[in-house]
A protein has these predicted regions:
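Active-site beta->alpha loop and helix N-cap motifs at the rims of alpha/beta catalytic domains
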Residues: 1-140, 148
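Catalytic alpha/beta core domains of metabolic enzymes, predominantly
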Residues: 122, 134-205
């Protein structure tokens, strides 16, 4: 599922609850266009502002309406224990993959970041996409560290920030040297998707 177009829907809310009818309409518009996969509860889906029960319901509704289209679910949280609970919820609801950013209140060392991904990957039964999003998380992952994380068997893809050319080609080529061949790269951001794909990314996230 880590190739092609992975569409990330908004999560519409009404009075602090998921607006299920509006959400289903959004999902239907995406599935009707023939996207390759869906990214539920990404940054576009406002995952950081939803509690566990809200997230669980979002995933349940999505799974019931996406048919055979693969579904990746964001499980980002500050506490590792909460991430593991979200992982369990997403997998039980039928997630086909997990989107995992590094979120932290305190600055972390490279070893601490690696240990986090290693621990989470011990508890997954589906592939994981490493979410490199320093602008939002304020956590910068060095290329060497991303390479170490990507070597974990559960890691299948990396979502990186989009860049314009020629920076996109330079970024993809540099990062690719640190990654196993089986791990795909995907660019995020609508405006920069073309540059990312032309630079060698296999996915438009």
């Amino acid at each position: 599922m880590f190739t092609g177009l992975c569409a990330f829907p908004l999560t519409p809310l009404h009075q602090q609850h998921l607006d299920e009818k509006a959400f289903i309409r959004i999902l239907s518009r995406l599935t009707d266009t023939g996207v390759d996969s869906l990214g539920i509860l990404g940054s576009t889906g406002s995952y950081a502002y939803l509690n566990r029960e809200q997230r669980k319901r979002v995933v349940q509704v999505a799974k019931a309406h996406v048919g055979s289209i693969p579904m990746m679910v964001g499980v980002g949280a500050i506490a590792t224990s909460e991430v593991l609970r979200l992982v369990e919820d997403a997998q039980q609801a039928g997630a086909d993959a997990l989107l995992l950013p590094m979120m932290s209140y305190q600055p972390l060392s490279a070893e601490e970041i690696f240990a986090f991904y290693e621990e989470v990957c011990r508890h997954v039964s589906v592939p994981v996409c490493l979410y490199d999003n320093p602008r939002t998380t304020h956590v910068t992952l060095a290329d060497e560290l991303q390479g170490r994380i990507a070597a974990l068997p559960a890691i299948a893809s990396i979502k990186i920030p989009g860049l314009p050319e020629p920076q996109a080609s330079e970024r993809v080529a540099t990062l690719r040297r640190h990654l196993p061949a089986r791990v795909t790269l995907g660019a995020s951001g609508d405006a920069l998707a073309t540059a990312g794909l032309q630079a060698g990314c296999q996915v438009w996230y």
